[in-house]
Amino acid sequence: MPFVGIISKENDSNFIKNAISKNSKESNFEIININRKSIENVKNVKFDILVICENIEKMIKNSSYLEEIIRKSDYIIVNSDIKENLSILKNVEANIITYGFNAKATITISSIKEEKMMICVQRKIKAVNSIIEEQDFNVEIEKNNVNKLYNVLVIFTILAIYGKILQKI
């Protein structure tokens, strides 16, 4: 059972958790939202994947636990549109996968048309049991989820690490 920690607003974390559950019925993911109040409670958890959706500068300054959580994680999925996070992760040895709407992101969106989007893997990713090559993936997206594109990139990446391809959200 993969342990996934998500540093994000609670509603984003819940959206990601529900979508992962819906799209990976045979894999039981344990997904935990991490915030300033809960960080001490999860300080000893080794996350298979740590997702960083928001700026963690203040959280790092106020808690030594986050550095330890980052250090112990196998994969770190980070929003590369938040530049401050990239400098914090400079010396981390985990598999770092970036996502965002910039040319340097590992996972980005190459196009959106009505209810379809193309998610682009721009660099090889070492998944748990395979390698994900550079390529585009077509994903159907419901109209009410169009404003959650960052979350869709996170969901795609988590599933891909475990060999699953997101087709509809």
Describe the function of each predicted region.
Residues I52, M59, L66-E67, I97-Y99, ...:
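Broad hydrophobic/π-residue packing in well-ordered secondary structure
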Residues S13, D81, K148-V152:
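Generic structural signal for well-ordered, non-membrane alpha-helical segments
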Residues P2, F101-I169:
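Adenine nucleotide phosphate-binding catalytic loops in nucleotide-utilizing enzymes
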Residues S27-N28, E54, R71-Y75, T98-F101, ...:
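Short, surface-exposed linear patches
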Residues M1-I76, E84-V92:
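Phosphate-binding loop of NTP-binding sites
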Residues E26, N95, I165:
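Residue-level detector of anion-binding/catalytic polar loops
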